[in-house]
Amino acid sequence: MKNAFKDALKAGRPQIGLWLGLANSYSAELLAGAGFDWLLIDGEHAPNNVQTVLTQLQAIAPYPSQPVVRPSWNDPVQIKQLLDVGAQTLLIPMVQNADEARNAVAATRYPPAGIRGVGSALARASRWNRIPNYLHQANDAMCVLVQIETREAMSNLASILDVDGIDGVFIGPADLSADMGFAGNPQHPEVQAAIENAIVQIRAAGKAPGILMANEALAKRYLELGALFVAVGVDTTLLARGAEALAARFGAEKKLSGASGVY
């Protein structure tokens, strides 16, 4: 078993991604052919469930883009279900400390290394037990990325980085800026300093730093600092702003929204 995304991070090859929030397999397949290295299927803020994640994994599978799935929480039951339908790389939100990071890793591993329940006869991940020795190979194919999104998590970054089985640490600029008192303004100098310091610290620890940033200049800056998995846009934003701009060019009465969202 292989995990191309995990292998790329280990090799130090920067991976450029796109966030998927439309919760739709048709749009996921459309974007899978766009040329991004990875696509994030969002179960935290988008209206996804296990079934919709499954259909998007199936839609992306024939393409080079690698799927990353974000569950709604660091929940071992939800993680088990997502792994069984075929997710190999998970982005776990709101990890605050090393204990929570260890719990995330344990949820992705079969015993004795972890607590993942065995249900491979029912699982797409094992191709319904058609993959020889799946139970003995699966642990090594898992890629665990944890999100740090608060001042508390930032203060615990060193201990989180020491957790065995953590492949990467993703900095959440929207929640971090809100927690630091600058909601909606991740470009505030204090937030930017925290992000840049974290990227350097994560890379120095031998882990992969990641972030979502639609501002092209900042995204390139993070890559220069050593970020290895960077999402540079969101499908919902691309569709909304693109549609508004097209309508405006043809004299639509509705003014452009002037959206002020983080992404």
UniProtKB/Swiss-Prot annotation:
Self-association and partners: Homohexamer; trimer of dimers.
| GO BP annotations listed | 4-hydroxyphenylacetate catabolic process; phenylacetate catabolic process
| One example GO MF annotation | 4-hydroxy-2-ketopimelate aldolase activity
Q: Does the keyword Membrane apply?
A: no
Q: What is this protein called?
A: 4-hydroxy-2-oxo-heptane-1,7-dioate aldolase
**EC number assigned by the record:** 4.1.2.52
Asked if the keyword Lyase belongs to this entry, the reply reads: yes
What HAMAP family does the annotation carry? HKHD_aldolase
Q: Which residues are marked as site: Increases basicity of active site His?
A: 84
Q: Where does substrate bind?
A: 147, 174-175
Q: Which SUPFAM superfamilies match?
A: Phosphoenolpyruvate/pyruvate domain
Q: List the NCBIfam families.
A: HpaI
Origin: domain of life: Bacteria
The entry assigns this protein to a family as follows: Belongs to the HpcH/HpaI aldolase family.
Query: What is this protein's function per UniProt?
Result: Catalyzes the reversible retro-aldol cleavage of 4-hydroxy-2-ketoheptane-1,7-dioate (HKHD) to pyruvate and succinic semialdehyde.
